[in-house]
Amino acid sequence: MASLRKIHPLMKITNDMVIDLPAPSNISVWWNFGSLLGLCLFSQILTGLFLAMHYTSDISTAFSSVVHTCRDVNYGWFIRSLHANGASFFFICIYLHIARGLYYGSYLYKETWTIGVVLLGLVMATAFVGYVLPWGQMSFWGATVITNLLSAIPYVGGTLVQWIWGGFSVDNATLTRFFTFHFLLPFIIAAATLVHLLFLHETGSNNPTGLNSDADKVSFHPYFSYKDLLGFLALLSALTSLALFSPNLLGDPDNFIPANPLVTPPHIKPEWYFLFAYAILRSIPNKLGGVLALLFSILVLVLVPILHTSKQRGLMFRPLTQTLFWTLVADMLILTWIGGMPVEYPFVIIGQVASTLYFLLFLVLAPTAGWLENKSLKWL
């Protein structure tokens, strides 16, 4: 008789996804980040639920309710620290997951990749509205500046901003709706993640060589389930260490000051994981141009499969495109650094050069390198 996990309607789905799933035998540690993102999402939803029990979405009490959670709730300080730093780990895993997809050509699974880009947008939206909730100085001014960018949209911009604010400025209505979105979006992300997995399991996983691995598959459990557990252990150790030893390392000191609409912070900036996009936004002197550049800095990922010109899938045997990939990594780090700097010389010009290079790498240099590599294969 067949095992229950293979015939029960619900257990069969789980079995096909995480137990008897055929996986390429040579996938490396870079394939761990998908499961780590699942762990991050679960951790964020869990800690977020406990924080929501003690939070009040009213401008007069929001800041105090966060202070109350940290001071008076049992282990409230730890839960908040895990949640705030968990967001940073979430984005570290996302960026590494995308980098692996770019390096090994996983973007050629177009449906999986497109849903992944949608997931990135949803996670960014969730993190942005979540950053507003403590109602500190940087929360308030970050919300004001970023939502105000929508006013650059012709004809409907002004109306759209007022509609999002729920009035003529960032106020109580804004905080209430941002809390609603922050509570709702993680569950939408969880649903989109299932769609992401559904599309992935239609094709099966890619592997480091970029070659067909049908002849060399192993079952997901126990080989990769234990490998994922080791990743879980490493991530949770790093997260708890940061939350316990240096919980405010990645935060902004201005957010310890309650929001004051009459005092502007000397330098408004988002959390570190948005700095690269913020640097691209600031590099364009025109408001609408900056908003479009910000939007396309994420949407350019959708074009990657379309602009793939190489006959080979990954970058394992493509030294020219490998060089461009590591140039992109360096460029992202430079943009992240520039996003945290004041708007003055020489940071402005460095940001503009780095932003131009960012788009050139995706739209021009990578497709050209792929074409040149195809040509070079004929010369060998």
UniProtKB/Swiss-Prot annotation:
Q: Where in the cell is it found?
A: Mitochondrion inner membrane
Q: What sections of the protein cross the membrane?
A: 33-53, 77-98, 113-133, 178-198, 226-246, 288-308, 320-340, 347-367
Q: How is the cofactor bound?
A: Binds 2 heme b groups non-covalently.
User: Which gene is transcribed and translated to give this protein?
Assistant: mt-cyb
Please give the function described in this protein's UniProt entry. Answer: Component of the ubiquinol-cytochrome c reductase complex (complex III or cytochrome b-c1 complex) that is part of the mitochondrial respiratory chain. The b-c1 complex mediates electron transfer from ubiquinol to cytochrome c. Contributes to the generation of a proton gradient across the mitochondrial membrane that is then used for ATP synthesis.
Output this protein's name. Answer: Cytochrome b
PANTHER family xrefs: CYTOCHROME B
Similarity comment: Belongs to the cytochrome b family.
Residues binding heme b b566 are H97, H196
Where does the chain bind heme b b562? H83, H182
Q: Tell me which cofactor or cofactors this protein depends on.
A: heme b
Q: Does the keyword Mitochondrion apply?
A: yes
Q: Which BP terms does GO give this entry?
A: mitochondrial electron transport, ubiquinol to cytochrome c
Report keywords, A-Z.
Electron transport, Heme, Iron, Membrane, Metal-binding, Mitochondrion, Mitochondrion inner membrane, Respiratory chain, Transmembrane, Transmembrane helix, Transport, Ubiquinone
- State whether it acts alone or in a complex, and with which partners, per the record: The cytochrome bc1 complex contains 3 respiratory subunits (MT-CYB, CYC1 and UQCRFS1), 2 core proteins (UQCRC1 and UQCRC2) and probably 6 low-molecular weight proteins.
Keyword NAD part of the UniProt annotation? no
